[in-house]
Amino acid sequence: MSRPLARKPPQSRRQQARVNRGRRRQELMTRSQRAVRWLQPGLVVKRWVLTSGLGLLMALVGGAVWADLKPIYWILETLSWLLGTLTTVLPREFTGPILLLVGVALVLWGQSRSFGSIQQALAPDKDTVLIDALQAQSRLNRGPNIVAIGGGTGLSTLLSGLKRYSSHITAIVTVADDGGSSGVLRRELGVLPPGDIRNCLAALSTEEPLLTRLFQYRFSAGGGLEGHSFGNLFLSALTAITGNLETAITASSRVLAVQGQVVPATNVDVRLWAELENGQRIEGESNIGHAPSPIVRLGCVPSRPPALPRALEAIANADLIVLGPGSLYTSLLPNLLVPELVSAIQRSRAPRLYICNLMTQPGETDGLDVRGHLRAIEAQLASLGLNQRLFSAVLAQDDLANSALIKFYQARGAEPVLCDAKGLRKDGYDVTQAPLQGARPTSTLRHDSRSLALAVMRFYRNHKRESSQ
């Protein structure tokens, strides 16, 4: 015989009812706070709601005039009778405030519920509240126009931090890579190397993390697939479908909800070459990174590749131009082999900032300090007939504390990039030093995206404040 179910004690039911009342009260307070936040300036919503309300009022007045004002007379008479009845029951000192509060509450409640329905329809699976998304987008839309030039992991690290400060970001990316998955696709399919572009798209993506991870996924097995990333294959396929990489990037940007734009430095097949101090000449980006002697000069075939109009337009409208961080000879200087890009940077009145690496790279920048990196940039420009200093502001790491991680890198031939700030300032450089590695312990010596972006934005704000004085 089954035992009867035990009834919940009265005390437990009262506690549950108290909890439910607390939850409802908390939900009501949250909704009220969200409703009030719609009144904050800068959302670019209220002006259009008010415009719609004004339009509705004008339409009603127009209809009433068309009907010989009879509807207006009837409405005024009805309101006069209703208000007179209310004031006979309750004094005006009570009636007015009560009607005002009820009206405001209804407006805010209706507004909150209507926008909540819109949010549920547009993005039912996202936890972001519409007012939060609008406030964040409004803040990002007020951000500066930033042009970041480079390639490799350094540029993608910078972009993932900068997207917290602005939605007007343009990444100009080198297309000289000939190693790894990009090199294979370049040789076999004849496409421009998609690897650095893929990294930048993923860094600027605001889509779900799973989609970004899919774009970055690298196959570890399978005949013909091993070593390739899904994003590289995706971009290569889109290039074949659309006919050019630029259109493929635009389509990929929509898929990943990219905040900003990614533009190749050029749309031609560029092959790098380097002259070494020992007189040797080596070809190919992957070989230059392991040069047996210091690099004297960098060049490419064809010698004067054209720039894309979107890149030139972005530089012309830039509020800030950033070069780096990244491999000096294989990620940064290849972009400066495009004469139109260099000319556009020279014409720009925006502050131009060079971000130096944390460590030297064996076979590429052995023994170079910050001044050595700047001299390499100036020497490269001089070889193109340009003697004007292109980047007069420098962002470098504070002195790195000696650690086991630094010793690990030193055992493999890398050294911290030293910065003689006083000497550089005497030479006319604007030097900023900051803790760019971040405070969290890491297994690699790389820039921290948040720390790096914060330092860049502080430089921009300081420059803007000084310029306005």
Task: Label each residue range with its predicted role.
Residues 117-147:
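N-terminal signal-anchor transmembrane helix
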Residues 328-338, 404-413:
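Glycine/threonine-rich flexible loop motifs
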Residues 335-342, 369-373:
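Charged helix-capping and loop-helix junction motifs
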Residues 153-159, 181, 329-337:
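Short glycine/serine/threonine-rich phosphate/pyrophosphate-binding segments
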Residues 318:
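An anion/phosphate-binding loop that grips the pyrophosphate of nucleotide cofactors and donors
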Residues 2-126, 176-293, 455-457:
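Electropositive, gly/pro-rich neighborhoods at or near active sites that engage anionic ligands
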Residues 4, 22-44, 367-469:
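C-terminal functional extensions of proteins
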Residues 167, 348-352, 429:
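A short helix->loop->beta-strand "cap" motif at the edges of active sites that frequently abuts
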